[in-house]
Structures are given as C-alpha cells and as structure tokens.
Amino acid sequence: MKNQVTSIGQSKRLIELGVPADRASMVYRKTNIVGIVRLEVKKGKGGVVAPAFTVADLLAVLPKKIMTNGGKVHILHIEACSSTSPCWCLYWGDEATQVGWQERISFLHLLEDAIEWLCLNGYKLNL
C-alpha cells in the first residue's frame, strides 16, 4: 500500500500545502493496541490520527490545465519515462514547452512533488 497511499508524514505535508484533509478517501486510525495505527477506508470519526490520500485522491486535485504568466495554457501530461529505469514523468505543456517537470520512480511521490511544485509556484489546485 505504501506506493498507493500517502504516509502520515506525506499527508501532513500535503495538508500544509493546501490539500484539504476531507479530500482523503482513507484515514490512519488508532487501534486498541498501544502504539499500533492502522490504515482503513473512512468510516466513523473516532481515533483518526491522520488522513491518507490515495493516488486517485491526488490525481483529482491536480489541475488538468495551468496558465503561465505569459497567458499560455499548458495541458497536464503524465507518462512513463523513456529512460532505462522504470519511472514516471509529469508536466504541463507539450514537446516544445514543459512546465513543472517532475520525474520519479514512485507514481505517488510524483503526484506529491507535482502538488508541492504547484503550490510553491502560485498555481491553484483543483479543489
């Protein structure tokens, strides 16, 4: 699941960046066993330690288009990299212009990095 759902630390960072906790479709919840936290689909309210964002949750908050300062609209592209090792790349634009380029082996980390780039560069999330 670590490649499909954010960790508690990743979730907290995404919330700091502006991703609303209610966009997470899962939560980390305390159990009756001391020191044990489990991941589960949202239900009920008790014992929630942190939200857990899935790949689908993060894809939903990425804008499909962004506009740069020059007024040019760039469309979101996500694809497998053409490098020798398996990886993913994400950017807005086309073959000539690529804005917000991210490249990671983990698809989850790719989405997390893209959200961070958007927020730190003044772009709005799809909320």
Task: Give the label of every model feature segment.
Residues 1-127:
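Glycine-rich anion-binding surface patch
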